[in-house]
Structures are given as C-alpha cells and as structure tokens.
UniProtKB/Swiss-Prot annotation:
Pfam family, one: Ribosomal_S3Ae
Record text on subunit structure and interactions: Component of the small ribosomal subunit. Mature ribosomes consist of a small (40S) and a large (60S) subunit. The 40S subunit contains about 33 different proteins and 1 molecule of RNA (18S). The 60S subunit contains about 49 different proteins and 3 molecules of RNA (25S, 5.8S and 5S).
Key word Ribosomal protein present: yes
InterPro entries referenced in this protein's UniProt entry, alphabetically: Ribosomal_eS1, Ribosomal_eS1_CS, Ribosomal_eS1_euk
Chief place where the protein resides: cytoplasm
GO biological process: translation
Gene Ontology CC terms: cytosolic small ribosomal subunit
Protein name: Small ribosomal subunit protein eS1
Keywords for the protein's UniProt record, in alphabetical order: Cytoplasm, Ribonucleoprotein, Ribosomal protein
GO molecular function, one term: structural constituent of ribosome
Amino acid sequence: MAIGKNKRISKGRKGGRKKVVDPLSRKEFYDLRAPSTFKVRNFGTTIASKNQGTKLAVDALRHRVYEVSLADLNNDEDQAFRKIKLQCEDIQGRTCLTEFHGMDMTRDKLCSLIRKYQTLIEAHCNVKTSDGYVLRLFCIAFTRRMADQVKSTCYAQTSQIRQIRKKMVEIITAEAEGTTLRDLVKKFIPESIGKEIEKACRHIFPLQHVFIRKVKVLSKPSFDVSRLMESHVGADGVEEKGTKVVSESNQATNLLTAEMKA
C-alpha cells in the first residue's frame, strides 16, 4: 500500500457525464385524417422518429392501425359502443391518409345485451366487395317475447335458429356484394343491415338487438392512390377544406363611439 493514499476518495469517471437529450427532439408529429364517410376528418395525431439515413419516417407510419370510437368520428355519443379501426395508407406532407380496416363492439355493450330467458344467435360469412376487398362479417341477434305472450321465456328451437342463421348469411351477402367498401361502411353506421335481418326473420321468430358485431378485413387489393383519394373527398366530389373564419374585430362595433357619432 502506498503511503498517504486515501481509499475513501472516489475517482472521477472517465469522460464525465453524458449530455441528456430530449427524446421528443428526435420525433415528428403527423395529423391523422379519416375518410369522408365520417363527420370528423382530423381525429388525432401520431408520432414518428425523424429521418435518419436510410430509415424514413414514412416507412414507420405506413400501415399503422388506429382504433377510434365512432362517437368521436361522428360527434354522436349514442354510437360510443362502436370501435372503428383505421389504417394509414399514404402520407402527404404532415398528414396521414387512413382507410377503413375493421369494426368491433365494446365489451360493456355486448355484455349488456346478453340476458337470461332468451336465445343468442350468431352467424358469420365472408364477402367480397366490388372494389376487391374481402371482409368477414359477424352478426349477432337475440330472440324476444311476442306481444301477447304470457310465458317469461322466449327460447327458439334448433330448426328456427338454423333458418334465422341462413337468412342472416343471405341478407349480409346480398347487402355487401356488389357495393364498394365506402358504401358498405355507410350501411354499418345506421345499422341498416341489422334492421333488414330483423324484418326478414319476423315470420320465423321475433328478434331484437340485431347488430353487425364485428368486421374483419381479410385481404385488400393492391394500393391505388386514386382510389384512396376518392375516399377522402366530400359527397360532391370536391376535397373538403376548412371554412374561412372572420376575425372578431371586423364584426364587432364600439357601441360608445356609435352613440357619440349619433
């Protein structure tokens, strides 16, 4: 041991402390834009790392899937039980253009529909739209009591369940095939397919709470920019733009000055 050496004195680290870098300084924010089927077009923002060498931010953003409540997309709280999946297909500047990628129902809504003394009927089928999308649609329905029924239960027989399930598949196939994905999504929002099934199965057994519970996108056609832009224009074929806001100073008048002039 060397004379005069104190072990308690700690040595300084080699190189000193590293400079703390804010992680967000290496990120970029992009706006998310929904198709024109929904009322609210800009529904949020997403984050991605800046371009570094061969790593591009566009590659990290493309094909990202975002799950949004339909209540936020349409400004309607009655549609809060619907969850819409939107997938980023293209990036233009700082805007991500998304496309419909699926639909689901919230767990609490599904549990609120399931009750005793009734029969739950489910069906699913694969359909192909006119623009080349292959979807798998899941339908759910519940039996209900007749108007003059005294018995508390409303169970359907197995033969009736088979007939209802067959009718479900027929109506879903007829409504989905021959239409574009954009028109099909418009049918999902007001539950027009469920109402059609309930009306068609009335003579077999009365139904209630008929919903398209879930939609899966199994396959998509090859990417086409023109098709994507068509889904992002308004109903009149013109791309939607923001309205001009008139400043308050141009509209407001000074009441005191107006009285003095009078």
